[in-house]
Amino acid sequence: MKTRKGIILAGGSGTRLYPVTMAVSKQLLPIYDKPMIYYPLSTLMLAGIRDILIISTPQDTPRFQQLLGDGSQWGLNLQYKVQPSPDGLAQAFIIGEEFIGGDDCALVLGDNIFYGHDLPKLMDTAVNRESGATVFAYHVNDPERYGVVEFDDNGTAISLEEKPQEPKSNYAVTGLYFYDNDVVEMAKNLKPSARGELEITDINRIYMDQGRLSVAMMGRGYAWLDTGTHQSLIEASNFIATIEERQGLKVSCPEEIAHRKGFIDAEQVKVLAEPLKKNAYGQYLLKMIKGY
């Protein structure tokens, strides 16, 4: 099986969240008990991806490095690259060309939170595809606010539209994408859109026109949370808090995922829990490894 590398795009200026984000990256803001970046990082970890590139702004990259380090504490290999200006999501593949090398890749947006019991299974199908691309569609009430995908009974995309006035479906394309290695050359050959950006929708459209774009449906029982407004930040935190308090289980806890995936052993979890043992997060980790 081919290696698949991951990219987290955590750039942007977060102007919609000013003044909150005037001095700190949006992706470092708390979503209940964790920094926002933990959630997309956990999504890639659940897909079994351990080589991950974090792309951010020149001013925020050192802060991500301070928080996450080289990833070895979780059995990961984290690298960092700067996106000098936000010139579109597809630019991630140009910035990450050297990191991706000859491998397939996955891209997740740093402000997208995914939740669902079968999410790892859904991603496994995308990971194991030999070629082509997979996007993840989520049913929304207001599709005109998103990139909208229409697909046939086999899950093959037949149309893609960006914020259409008359949507052909209620399925929005989420901020999680799996691509074969062809994506790098596609991104390098893209022309900027009318708003001057290299659009991810244009990449997806190329795959669709080639008949190589699969759509994985996030149906009932999944949550996709976008955190672009003050209100949605509160809603995301409340959602995570409700689940964690009700079940007594953490959502998107990198230490737990790394341990369950066999990236690290119980002894390493203990080391990571030690500085946190006075709070609920650290106590959760210590409780988790009891019996190991």
Swiss-Prot record:
It catalyses: dTTP + alpha-D-glucose 1-phosphate + H(+) = dTDP-alpha-D-glucose + diphosphate. Pathway: Carbohydrate biosynthesis; dTDP-L-rhamnose biosynthesis; Bacterial outer membrane biogenesis; LPS O-antigen biosynthesis. GO terms for biological process: dTDP-rhamnose biosynthetic process; O antigen biosynthetic process. Keywords: Lipopolysaccharide biosynthesis, Magnesium, Metal-binding, Nucleotidyltransferase, Transferase. It comes from the Bacteria. The keyword Transferase applies. This is Glucose-1-phosphate thymidylyltransferase 1. It comes from Shigella flexneri. The lineage of its organism: Bacteria, Pseudomonadati, Pseudomonadota, Gammaproteobacteria, Enterobacterales. The gene is rfbA.
